[in-house]
A protein has these predicted regions:
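Structural recognition of the conserved hydrophobic beta-strand(s) that form the central parallel beta-sheet
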Residues: 48, 90-91, 107, 127-134
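Conserved catalytic core of Hanks-type protein kinase domains
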Residues: 83, 108, 153
Length: 154
């Protein structure tokens, strides 16, 4: 594990998205947090979210919600993308994302902006994405279950 954390420091030097494969339990969380803490984004927010077991509505809400109407809610009305602005977003279990959510993430990452659903202007975003998967994403791409474009971006 110590060797992986040392390697994380190398990835921290880049601002590119990172994909962590094969780590189970909390190891991927520790690696992602080490990348963030050693990066130039260390003073920005670090947001982690686990996609396992979420249906499409929960995935969309967890990542892209912009409403401030529910301050009592788990996300305080704001999705992980907005919370991670100027910081790092770690998505554990990225293989569990639906294709629709994958395409929304891809569009957000490429445009560096998020279209609001409440008719407000576009929110500019500066988020570094770190994903983790126990499954080889290339296999899922071949099965039509994962976006090849998103795989190339991360």
């Amino acid at each position: 594990m110590q060797q992986l954390l040392e390697e994380a420091k190398i990835y921290a030097l880049s601002s590119s998205p990172v994909m962590i494969y094969g780590q189970a339990g909390i190891e991927d969380y520790l690696i992602a947090e080490a990348i963030h803490n050693n990066s130039d984004r260390r003073n920005g927010p670090y947001v982690s979210i686990n996609m396992r077991g979420m249906d499409i509505e929960k995935q969309m809400e967890a990542l892209f919600s912009r409403e401030d109407a529910d301050p009592e809610g788990a996300n305080g009305g704001r999705g992980a993308m907005l919370k991670a602005d100027r910081g790092t977003l770690f998505i554990k279990g990225i293989e569990h994302l639906t294709l629709r959510v994958q395409h929304q993430i891809l569009r957000t990452m490429l445009s560096r902006a998020m279209m609001r659903t409440d008719a407000q202007p576009i929110d500019a975003l500066d988020v570094r994405l770190i994903g983790s998967s126990k499954v080889n994403l290339q296999k899922l791409v071949k099965q039509g279950k994962f976006s090849e474009e998103l795989k190339l971006v991360i």
